[in-house]
């Protein structure tokens, strides 16, 4: 058994999976970011206006970054009513890619902010192929601090080092 495990480890080491190239510019349906408050504070006090504003700010940051990299953001108005009924497009059994394909996009981009506490937040982005539904790039980063600056840095890091990471 030890020999089999050692052989498998050697095989995997000798034949690494090739790194996937960053996605090429195309048409992207960005469904914005969703804020999910899992904290006790949220359960007791409800939605905080500064976090709603911060979610919009971070969505704009992601959209601007995509455009700066040569992507075309397709209008999502034709699916807006359906999108309103979806709690979280990041986790909807492929509804994001189905809507992106319907909109004529090459990619579906979704993201979320999970607030664990006022100190710990988890930021996530997912870029999927609209036709196949395959996840092309996805990443999560935990940040410390619930400020505009920590959110900006977190999403900038995700875009630069995960979604558009070079080999």
Annotate the PLM regions.
Residues 1-5:
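Bacterial N-terminal signal peptides that target proteins for export
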Residues 8:
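Short catalytic/metal-binding and nucleic-acid-binding patches
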Residues 14-16:
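N-terminal signal peptide c-region/cleavage motif recognized by signal peptidases
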Residues 20-40, 57-61, 68-70, 97-102, ...:
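C-terminal/domain-edge helix-coil "capping" segments
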Residues 42-53, 85-86:
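Second-shell loop/turn segments in exported
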Residues 48-78:
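N-terminal, post-signal-peptide region of Sec/Tat-exported proteins
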């Amino acid at each position: 058994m030890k020999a089999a495990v050692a052989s498998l480890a050697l095989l995997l080491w000798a034949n690494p999976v090739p790194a996937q190239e960053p996605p090429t510019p195309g048409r992207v349906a960005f469904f914005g970011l969703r804020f999910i408050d899992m904290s006790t504070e949220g359960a007791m006090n409800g939605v905080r206006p500064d976090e709603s504003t911060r979610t919009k700010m971070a969505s704009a940051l992601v959209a601007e970054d995509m455009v700066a990299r040569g992507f075309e953001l397709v209008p999502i108005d034709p699916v807006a009513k359906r999108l309103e009924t979806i709690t979280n497009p990041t986790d909807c059994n492929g509804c994001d890619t189905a809507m992106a394909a319907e909109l004529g996009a090459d990619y579906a981009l979704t993201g979320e902010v999970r607030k664990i506490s006022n100190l710990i937040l988890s930021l996530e982005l997912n870029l999927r192929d609209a036709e196949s539904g395959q996840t092309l790039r996805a990443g999560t980063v935990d940040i410390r601090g619930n400020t505009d600056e920590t959110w900006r840095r977190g999403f900038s890091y995700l875009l630069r080092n995960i979604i558009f990471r070079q080999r």
